């Protein structure tokens, strides 16, 4: 955690003060909140992950004035993330990994782990924020926001999380 606290604060700052409700090209929302949820340390049957994701979402709800939308989204994503990690990575491998990153998992396995979670985040956000899910505009929003955030997550990991930081916890 010692080496990863600065990138974590940078992501919080970006989400709250810079990228707060910024819409790119009328379809893309960049949300570093997804990156925080993805890179958080996995612990089997951990209530800590749910509590941290709730308060993280609550922090963004305060700044977005969104009445619990981000809290609900973060808790649902954190809950299904724990199930997805066991399904994709396996229980024996998760015990030896401190950080679920591209460096630790490899490119393809990280894509299989991260991209469905990112899609789920934007699907839940879109469903509750816009009120409709299967319109063409919402599907384009979900798809383009997911792709842009995945690219941002990969770039962030290669810039700020090098191989030396893998042994440290992201908590």
PLM regions: where:
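Terminal, non-globular segments
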Residues: 1-171
